Amino acid sequence: MTGPGTHDGEDLPRLVEVLGALSVAIDLGLGQPAEHMLRSATIACRLSDRLGLPPEQRDTVYYSTLVMWIGCHADSQEYARWFGDDIAVRHDAYLVDWAGIPYLRFLLGNVAKGEPLAQRLKVMGTLFRDAHGQLATLVHSHCASAASLAQHIGLSPEVATTLAYTFERYDGRGLPVGASGDQIPIEMRVAQFADIAEVHHRTFGLDAMTAMARSRRGGQFDPAVVDAALTSPEELLAAAPDGDEWKEALNWAPDREVRLTGEHLDRLVCAIGDFVDLKCPFTLGHSRAVATLAAAAGERLGMGPAEVHTLRRAGHLHDLGRLGVSNQLWANQGSLSPSEWERVRMHPYLTERVLDRIPGLGGVRTVARAHHEHLDGTGFPLGVGGTMLGRSERTLAAAVAYQSALEPRPYRDAMSPQQARERLRGRSRAGRLDPDCVDAVLAVAGHRPSRLRRDDLLTPREHEILGLVSRGFSNREIASRLVLSEKTVRNHVERTYTKIGATNRVGASLYALQHGLVTHLNDPD
């Protein structure tokens, strides 16, 4: 018997395998090697046992550690504004204590890094005019986003609550509220230590990790957690017995035997696609739209249900690898250097590497990897073409090209449907895209209304505001664009957030996704 949404013979993955792969995608955005968060989860569970935590708390520790930084990609746009390369600064932040002079020195060294001196001084002035307030706002947004995304992918309320304390410190000098001591859930106190300890042990060795733990005892970390960790630290940090860190980490999962139904998997891949799209404001709703277009085009081409299902899932997951490329590149308004362009071209390969972790999604992985390949071999990452690309790969490539054209990019405005159609036809005539797949994508796109419904909850002006906020515009930029005062914009934003129950840009973006407003929000002016 098969579950809802399951096709006969379909070998579906376990829940923890999908979430484990998601953690590898999170590693990409942290600038850490694959399996960092998985290994941190293993360390955290071992530490939980040393502390005598009951099973239900250890379960929360596991998933809180595994997806601890799920919110970091949602605020990549903001990080890039302050620090330039969001991935590089996150990588380097692991090496400093986040308080006092060392952290101030770290901030000074990374604000607007790589920009001309005048621009650096301008950004520094803006940030340090109210450094605590600016960082608290950023951290609050991160924590709210992490909690929302955790629930969006089906994790427990306990995990969502724990993630709100990610940036707090035992000594009360953390953010966003300055919680201290036992005000911070023990699950987060354990997760924080495991996350940092894994990096220092892997990078500098056991002695350096031990010195780091002692120096931060009672400051960043709970003394009881540090003391438990430093009792035989070599055992706590030991590699998996057979060297398979993936297997070791998954064995600690509380629901390690839970296998997904097809319907549950579909909800999960949709949520993961939404999560990826939040990395850049201008890609909001991209993966959902691509999945819908590609699946409908596949049906029009006469594909069977299983092939269409694979195509739809590939549409949701095709851009996972974008998490491994800095927003500094995605937001570039000019030309990329050869090395920068090479990093961008790697993102489909990174998608493949992440999906390779999930049993039962081999077909999805193959199709998703090829979303930028061309029939004439001029695409990337492999440059394959012709018979090397199946019908599903060709259909996804056409759907991605069409949907991307409809969306704004930092270097161009969104195209009209007519302009997107001509762009697609041109690529078909040039031999890059399959003519039949292009025809199918354009046919199904032509049957869709040009604008999705508005939500009656919001006024037309609030719809405008929601669209601009979701696309990453600041209040000042919105005021300039709409010829309003900043105070008026701020009032509109506050009313809109109150109406939709959001507290930040990510919450507003998710609301727009869940209520079918994204096509309207991405319409060109």
Predicted regions and their residues:
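Histidine- and acidic-residue-rich, metal-dependent catalytic cores
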Residues: 2-457, 463, 519
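Hydrophobic residues on short alpha-helical segments
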Residues: 191, 396, 466-467, 497, ...
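Short helix/strand-capping hinge loops at secondary-structure junctions
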Residues: 204, 280, 472-473, 503
